[in-house]
Amino acid sequence: MKKFSIILILFSLATVSCSKMLDVQPTDSISASQAIKDKSGVENAITGSYNALHSTSIYGRYQVIVEDLAADNLIWTGTTQDYSQIANHTIAADNGIIDGIWSLNYDCINRVNNVLSRIPDIDMNTDDRNLYTGDGLFMRALCHFNLLCYFGGIPIKTQPTVDLSSINQARNTVPQVYDQIISDLLQAEQLLPATRTLGYASAFSATALLARVYLTRFQQTNDPSIAELAIEKASKVISNGGYTLSPDYAGLFNGNATESIFEIVSDVQNRTLLAQYFFPRSLLGRYEVSPPANFVQSFLLTDTTRFIASIAFDTTKLPYGFKYKDITAGTDRVYVLRLAEMYLIRAEARAYSNGNIEDIRNDVNVIRARAGLDPTTSTDYNELKLVIENERRHEFAFESQRWSDLVRTKRATTVLGISENFTLFPIPLSELQTNTLMTQNPGY
């Protein structure tokens, strides 16, 4: 993996408008201006950027698994040693999975930047220009936010990396990265349409991601004005987005899309291998990860709806993650943003800023009611914070949320028993070797 970052730069330059892998020699490489020369080229490049989110290292596998494996919803039960390091919080700088998350998020950013740099020169109508610009800004913000949550301050990339001479870039500060993410999303919110085909971002996708970003920034700064922004954006999605909670939790993973704000759509061309990594070997899976006993036992006896949709057992009573079921074709949907999160974002922002107790309970109880649980009646802020944490743990199990939840609320050190340094992942060795201005995170 040592030269993975350089390889990805070359690859993205050679395939800027492609949605498929091509075997291209360096002499065949073409510039963005050559590849993206009309509206069709822009559309293809945007599709290729969305497909990059589907890559193995982002929502196709690694990032989804790492969020629960680095926390307490999954344990390592397979043969891939890089997963063992993540589960045991002994991550080396040359860990291939962490390297992949870093490199492929930046690859998606570079693809988007190539498109955004060309859009002003392409002849197209205003609606199309706004649409594709909004797409690019949304994806750039999402990938920068992924990297920020895992690595802290990172280099902000808003221009294409056109050759290897431009890879040396120092880390921006955490506030600077937040400012860039928020700026991109506020623009995307204005440029994108209110409704969109599944798998593509809408204006409300940008609003929902803003709610998540504001909540995370609030938890780092304790600035109540930022909590209000998180509440405002979550409320906008809840009230105006036209989404409805799936009446049946299991329906979320069996075709019901009324709750989906943004998701990764899988098909035979863009498969996800998540089911293979969760399913036991008796069911032809790899069983690289599995829910530990303490997580299995953490579900309330009345929380049967979420339990049955999340965890299953083979004939030997071996537990395994069950949200991703298509082990043959790999067409499982992967949620990035859905409506339930907006209720819990609003509840968390209010709970941590001493908001109205009844409003907090109401939002939590919407989610509990769907799960078939009795409403919480707590009147204590600290109790409600733990109720929200617990709801998120079970509501979003295996949906790329748990690690970020614990780090955001500063609970990772207590819940996981790790040092503060290890709430960030190491900067990959490949990046340190190729970017002379990069510095490693403390403790690695």
Segment roles from a protein language model:
Residues 1-27:
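Bacterial Sec-dependent N-terminal signal peptides
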Residues 18-65, 91, 375, 414-444:
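Membrane-proximal, proline-rich intrinsically disordered regions
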Residues 32-33, 60-78, 165, 193-209, ...:
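Short, surface-exposed recognition loops and adjoining beta-strand edges that mediate ligand/DNA contacts
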Residues 43, 51, 81-151, 187-196, ...:
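Conserved, well-structured interaction surfaces
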Residues 82, 86, 96, 235-355, ...:
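Elongated scaffold/linker segments in the mid-to-C-terminal portions of large proteins
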